Amino acid sequence: PLYNHRLYSGFGRGDFFEAKELDKGIVRLKTLYEKVPPIGSIFISKGEYLFNRQSPAFRVFKSKNLLFKQINVHHAGAMGLIAERSADITLDGFNVVLREGSDRGVTTTADATHFCNCKGEITIRNCTFENMLDDATNIHGTYARVKKVINDNQIAYETYHPHQKDYLFGEKGDSVQIVDQKTLM
């Protein structure tokens, strides 16, 4: 059965569990919550923030005209596929699924698929995404803060989200759009 996991989840609150192994396979978790999950519940952890997205099944960077066909990802310690600064990608039968007969509860510890700063067409067809700990897909660009306007053609920028560490935001020849942080206009 599915339970109201929000009653027991610390996502977004910065709560961490203190864990102590009492016996082989028996762990006591101390929490601030008044309610505890029902006996028999399965505890699933994504791992420590900023260290839980380091092992995608596939990483694509600066590539184009790709076809991922009839691929099954059964587990990854991050996304099933992350594509950055690439173009024209087709997923046809790219499945993020539990292996048949597996007793695992999780496929990927993040999104099944993630496309960042890609261009052209991204096609997803005949795919199944299940049991991941985040979204089926994310397709987006990237925001960065303008730190300084150098001249009419140059800016200095800074990234601010922890997942953007060492991220290649732009290159010579790229065009950027300046928007207001509050209105995105």
Residue ranges of predicted features:
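Polyanion-binding and phosphate-handling cores
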Residues: 114-125, 130, 139
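Extracellular beta-strand-rich solenoid/capping regions of secreted or surface-exposed proteins
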Residues: 52-63, 78-86, 113-117
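Glycine-centered loop/turn positions within well-structured domains
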Residues: 79, 89, 135
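Interface-prone segments of viral and bacterial extracellular assemblies
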Residues: 76, 110, 115, 120, ...
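All-beta strand scaffolds that present successive hydrophobic residues in beta-strands
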Residues: 44-45, 65-70, 88-94, 121-127
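Residues that flank catalytic or metal-binding motifs in active/ligand-binding sites
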Residues: 87, 109, 133
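Extracellular polysaccharide-degrading/modifying enzymes targeting complex plant/algal/animal polysaccharides
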Residues: 1-74, 99-105, 130-185
